[in-house]
Amino acid sequence: MSTNQGSLWGGRFAGGPSDALAALSKSTHFDWALAPYDVTASRAHAVVLFRAGLLTEEQRDGLLAGLDSLASDVADGSFGPLVSDEDVHAALERGLIDRVGPDLGGRLRAGRSRNDQVATLFRMWLRDAVRRVATGVLEVVAALGDQAAAHPTAIMPGKTHLQSAQPILLAHHLLAHAHPLLRDVERIVDFDKRAAVSPYGSGALAGSSLGLDPDAIAADLGFTTAADNSVDATASRDFAAEAAFVFAMIAVDLSRLAEDIIIWSSTEFGYVTLHDSWSTGSSIMPQKKNPDIAELARGKSGRLIGNLTGLLATLKSQPLAYNRDLQEDKEPVFDSVVQLELLLPAMAGLVGSLTFDVERMAALAPAGYTLATDVAEWLVRQGVPFRSAHEAAGAAVRTAEERSVGLEELTDDELAAISPELTPQVRDVLTIEGSVSARDSRGGTAPKRVAEQLQIVREITARLGHELMR
């Protein structure tokens, strides 16, 4: 049987919890990550208690000195949780009491509950964590942008359904991976507007009767405002679910990029060569160079999706207000951050180190009759209705297939036999260079448009980097 010594809730109970309950309740193995934020919030709480007339100046200064000492010891690892500590809050109260005594240390608990306390700390931790994740995402975007800049005119087969569709610029394709990642960072910036609301002062659920100033402590802790509803503030974890979604979306976007790299590096495609420093070998096959980073990115996306769905399942049936189920809210979010902080630098390094075989990609770009759409659109520009143009281009493909040649190898007579509108001038679009250059609409694959897109990506990256520093 455990004891209630050091517990934050033992007065009403004649004895301690069972060993099984104590083991089940224990959370220091994961919530110790909140310790620096807990100490910071306790400093702000001491100041608010003083302003409310609940501490003398001497008591306030004594608590602040004790908290400074505790913060230093937490930071250097000389203070940590004991087996008997139920959670991070109990461990830190024990540490504070060791430094300032039980009378003074016990005064800090006035006006706050673990319910509003942990909701606040979780938001503080997440606001820092999402910035670290966003910085890592922007590094992947920068690597994509650098590769795009290094290959401004390289042409590759653009695909739909994994079938060759139309020629596009390699830079165009790479930047298509950058934009979703930038939207992920924009989601993080937007998320912070909702996360920057402080639950502190909400108590267990009903608020405080001690004359505390939630707005003051919100400002002291870097929040933009205090919560409008104390029940909502202590019971809601939609901010955690929103963050978990953004993390999962980042993982999904990385997984799609990773899938391309895995396919491109295969012998059959041969678009890219992996750098030795960013790939691994086989324990039995000496020739192998494996895209482990990309494969781990693909695998971890499932893990982060699972973290999101698990959290949502935890939240779905809880009555207001706080329930102990919410002890399960942090581990999936913490894990998602840990995984992304491992993955993002590796993905940035992998992307930046890829060597592209631009000659092979260009040679494959017209394969599969990818210039057929150019033939149809050329006919449209000559005044042919698109239905007729589509049929003529399809007939040209059929003729080329029967002869086992490319569209560009059809003779003038063969083209004219298919449609009198297919004059020799159509050959202007029967090159991959002509095809990509013709697609100069906004967002298109023409070199000048892709150069604009690269500039836009870099401008958005710079703007988001600035917003994350606020």
Swiss-Prot record:
SUPFAM superfamilies: L-aspartase-like (SSF48557). It comes from the Bacteria. GO terms for biological process: arginine biosynthetic process via ornithine; L-arginine biosynthetic process. Pathway: Amino-acid biosynthesis; L-arginine biosynthesis; L-arginine from L-ornithine and carbamoyl phosphate: step 3/3. Its EC number is 4.3.2.1. It is found in: Cytoplasm. InterPro entries: Arg_succ_lyase_C, Argininosuccinate_lyase, Fumarase/histidase_N, Fumarate_lyase_CS, Fumarate_lyase_fam, Fumarate_lyase_N, L-Aspartase-like. One of its GO terms (cellular component) is cytosol. GO terms for molecular function: argininosuccinate lyase activity. It catalyses: 2-(N(omega)-L-arginino)succinate = fumarate + L-arginine. Keywords: Amino-acid biosynthesis, Arginine biosynthesis, Cytoplasm, Lyase. It is an enzyme of class 4 (lyase). Belongs to the lyase 1 family. Argininosuccinate lyase subfamily. NCBIfam families: argH. This is Argininosuccinate lyase. The lineage of its organism: Bacteria, Bacillati, Actinomycetota, Actinomycetes, Mycobacteriales.
